[in-house]
Design a protein with these regions (language model features):
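Small/polar-rich, solvent-exposed N-terminal microdomains that initiate assembly or binding
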Residues: 1-42, 93-100
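A broad, low-specificity signal marking well-ordered, structured residues that form hydrophobic/aromatic
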Residues: 28-31, 49, 134
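Hydrophobic side chains in beta-strands
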Residues: 34, 53, 138-140
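Short acidic, glycine/tyrosine-flanked loop/strand segments centered on an H-E-D-like triad
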Residues: 46-66
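Short secondary-structure subsegments characteristic of cysteine-rich extracellular domains
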Residues: 66-83
Length: 145
């Protein structure tokens, strides 16, 4: 798990690429992109989160191979587990049935640019599931024991 600005996440991944110990341990990855808006009302804080779940892939895969090898076998199971545990979190105040978000399957992501025309942000060949605008409410003063 990583969190931060997308460029910071890429810098961390680049450092891992240079490390013999972590070069092949970068993926699968769940990353929370910051900054995000927080709306505060009383003791409740509501945030709209942008998250990516990604794994490395082969640059010569066709879409059907990507779905079979990376999405069905790796990314979808991670997505399902992530959402299951996110909904069960005692810190989430949104009812599980009321969570709203946009899910995007990103085939061959990382070579055409992540946000607009900034160019490539991820330096690896990856397939990903992007979760946009995951709206959830949290207690303002929740503490982890």
């Amino acid at each position: 798990f990583l969190h931060g600005h997308p460029r910071e996440i890429v810098q961390i991944l680049s450092k891992k690429t240079s490390s013999r110990n972590f070069k092949f341990k970068k993926y699968p990855l769940i990353a929370l992109f910051q900054d995000f808006n927080e709306y505060i009302s009383g003791d409740i804080r509501t945030a709209s989160l942008n998250i990516v779940i990604c794994t490395n892939t082969k640059n010569d895969y066709e879409a059907s191979e990507r779905y079979q090898d990376t999405f069905l076998n790796e990314l979808y199971p991670i997505f399902d587990l992530f959402m299951k545990h996110f909904k069960r979190s005692p810190y989430i105040q949104t009812l599980p049935g009321n969570l709203s978000y946009t899910k995007i399957d990103r085939l061959y992501w990382g070579r055409t640019g992540l946000y607009g025309n900034e160019g490539n942000i991820f330096n690896d060949f990856i397939d990903a599931i992007e979760i946009q605008n995951l709206n959830a409410s949290f207690l303002l003063n929740c503490q982890i024991n």
